[in-house]
Amino acid sequence: MIGFIGFGRTGKAVATAILENKEFSLEWVYRRKTLLENRSIAEFLGIESDEIGKLYSSEHTAVEDLLDKQPVDFIIDFSSSTGIYSYGKAAASRGVKIISAISHYAKEDIAFMKTLAKDTTVFWSPNITLGVNFLLLASKSLKKIAP
């Protein structure tokens, strides 16, 4: 079970790939915008899926409440370098693993993530977005080749 923080271009592409894969479940997307809040992620992306995950806004839903009511195993962060501060402690205290797709962090942000890593797994690579984009492009190409 996966939760997303942020929902930009790369996040939407990865969400689409997850929704199309029956082995994973995208439970929710948590973002600042209130536009289309509580709508189906699949509907928002315009794809067919049996997944019931929804969009939530930080303006109306506390991340602690979301993690308690709809627990996930992983959070994939597509927000910004400061996004980790909005959910990091809540996720770590619940043992939720954090995967950051943020390209650059300041030294103090990295130190904060190391603190979180004492309670949960925190994965971050400065080039993860480049890698994710490559994998998405490769998977699209393979779909065209494979029957």
Locations of regions flagged by a protein language model:
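Rossmann-fold NAD(P)-binding glycine/threonine-rich loop
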Residues: 82-94, 101-142
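Glycine-rich Rossmann-fold phosphate-binding loop(s) that bind the pyrophosphate
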Residues: 7
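Extreme N-terminal starter segment of soluble prokaryotic enzymes
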Residues: 1-3
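Glycine-rich, highly charged phosphate/nucleotide-binding loops
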Residues: 46-68, 76-82
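N-terminal Rossmann-fold NAD(P) dinucleotide-binding loop
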Residues: 11-12
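NAD(P)-binding Rossmann-fold cofactor-contacting core
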Residues: 20-51
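Short acidic/histidine-rich motifs immediately flanking catalytic phosphotransfer sites
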Residues: 68-75, 92-98
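Internal alpha-helical scaffold of NAD(P)-dependent oxidoreductase catalytic cores
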Residues: 143-147
